């Protein structure tokens, strides 16, 4: 048997130490609970989705909206891998450029809006052909597949000087998480017949993040019909109450659904596991 001071003994000790340290290094990267995906609402249409594999997606990151749980969130989020922008309006583009510059997040949106956001300061090397697409296209984002689906709205983009730029077509997102749920973020939209095709194309939608405020989008009654088309397990209302004009409420959505689906109202800033 080699002595404790022999070269073989020292190498063996180093190998044991490395193996012992490996689990600690692997656990340093924060992840959602095994098999669970965390969804955090930040008010309006802004969400953060963290997959079981640790991929972080920010959707329509207007993190400085009036319903945000605290100020300065764009400077505080520790990690974002991808930023999904449904259309070009200020309340959905939000803090995307600042967040991208700080985190290195890649942009997932339509090609036209992507080009306009690059012109407005979004880092060009984070908005390439690998993540820009168009309706019907699927982008692989870590352990999530993001498909751009139809929405009925407008999408003009105005830069910080008020100049208008192309915004392409508005869209929603279907996010299929490997080992996790299928999420549908409607974006801003009216009720559409296209929604009927989502279960056939993607299977069961687990969580539908749906606009309900009215005036610019579906109101609660229209959203309830949309829920009937999509048939999700859980409905999370969004895009309501931020401004006086978008006055639809989760209570009105519940009443219109008549118990046909679970309505779960998220508290801004509090992650929920699905």
Swiss-Prot record:
Q: Out of the domains of life, which is the source?
A: Bacteria
Repressor keyword on record: no
Q: Which cysteines are joined by disulfide bonds?
A: none
Q: Name one GO molecular function term.
A: hydrolase activity
Q: Does the keyword Hydrolase apply?
A: yes
Q: Give the matching SMART domains.
A: Lactamase_B
Where, by residue number, does the polypeptide cross the bilayer?
none
Q: Please provide the record's keywords in A-Z order.
A: Hydrolase
Q: NCBIfam families in the record, alphabetically?
A: PRK00685.1
What family is reported? Answer: Belongs to the UPF0173 family.
> What is the recorded name of this protein?
UPF0173 metal-dependent hydrolase AnaeK_1127
The protein's organism comes out as Anaeromyxobacter sp. (strain K)
């Amino acid at each position: 048997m080699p002595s404790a001071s022999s070269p073989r003994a020292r190498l063996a000790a180093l190998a044991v130490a490395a193996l012992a340290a490996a689990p600690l290094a692997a656990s340093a990267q924060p992840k959602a609970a095994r098999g669970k995906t965390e969804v955090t609402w930040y008010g309006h249409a802004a969400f953060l989705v963290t997959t079981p594999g640790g991929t972080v997606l920010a959707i329509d990151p207007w993190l400085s909206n009036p319903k945000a749980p605290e100020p300065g969130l764009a400077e505080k989020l520790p990690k974002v891998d991808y930023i999904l922008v449904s259309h070009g309006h200020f309340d959905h583009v939000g803090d995307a450029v600042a967040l991208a510059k700080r985190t290195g997040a890649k942009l997932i949106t339509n090609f036209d809006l992507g080009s306009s956001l690059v012109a407005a300061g979004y880092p060009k090397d984070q908005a390439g052909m690998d993540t820009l697409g168009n309706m019907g296209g699927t982008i692989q984002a870590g352990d999530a597949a993001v498909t751009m689906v139809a929405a009925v709205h407008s999408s003009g983009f105005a830069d910080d000087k008020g100049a208008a730029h192309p915004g392409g077509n508005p869209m929603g997102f279907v996010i299929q998480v490997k080992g996790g749920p299928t999420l549908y973020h409607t974006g801003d939209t009216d009720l559409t017949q296209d929604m009927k095709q989502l279960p056939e194309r993607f299977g069961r939608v687990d969580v539908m993040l749906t606009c309900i405020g009215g005036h610019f989008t579906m109101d609660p009654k229209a959203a309830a019909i949309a829920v009937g088309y999509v048939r999700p397990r859980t409905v999370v209302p969004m895009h309501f109450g931020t401004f006086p004009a978008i006055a639809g409420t989760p209570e009105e959505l519940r009443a219109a659904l008549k118990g046909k689906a679970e309505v779960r109202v998220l508290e801004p800033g509090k992650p929920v596991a699905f």
